[in-house]
Amino acid sequence: NPLESIVFITLPEDFQISKAAMHIDTTIPLPVQLPLGTDKDAKFDIKTLSEEMILAGILTVLAYDKGNSNLNYYRSIISKAKPNIKKELTEAAILKARNEDFDIAEEIFDALRGLDPEDMGTVLNTALFFDQRADSYRKSGLLEDADAYDNDAEFYYKQAMESEPVIPDAFFNAGFFYLKQKNFSKGKECFEIYLAYVIDIK
């Protein structure tokens, strides 16, 4: 469980460096990613705290602790500290997926959806990722895993196709997905909707 490497700390009022740079509210516990091999039960030394540990902690919480009551605050911290974070993470996730480093790619997509749950571009990218992962596992003969990832892909394709405003590419990619599933009627329906939107846009 990735959350096991996280500790929540409350910064002292006189903590200035990161507080000034990252707009820290010292009344709200801050998630911190502990370095590998650190004893979680040992008292945390505030002098070892870095911006990277805070950002990594926040991303982990965004990815795996969807019920945390401070998510909006954590999102605001990371967005102010790293204005281009979504672009950077998206590029990293796509690169990891392309290199078939699937577990890391999935973690990054989880963090991206936690960072901005309303971003349907991220939802569509997640669908494409699971689609690719299913194809890779199927080619390797891991059919049960492939079927599970197909289910994940369909879940996110459906979300992307319900997006407002409409994302035509969601229907285009879902069409190919359903063709691979041999669900030809659903694939045809997706392509027809895609064409209707594209022609209308032109």
Predicted regions and their residues:
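Canonical positions in the second alpha-helix
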Residues: 111-112, 159-160, 193-194
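TPR alpha-solenoid repeat register
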Residues: 121-122, 170
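Short coil turns that delineate tetratricopeptide repeat
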Residues: 83, 117, 164-165, 199
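TPR-adjacent "capping" and linker segments in tetratricopeptide-repeat scaffold/adaptor proteins
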Residues: 43-47, 72-90, 202
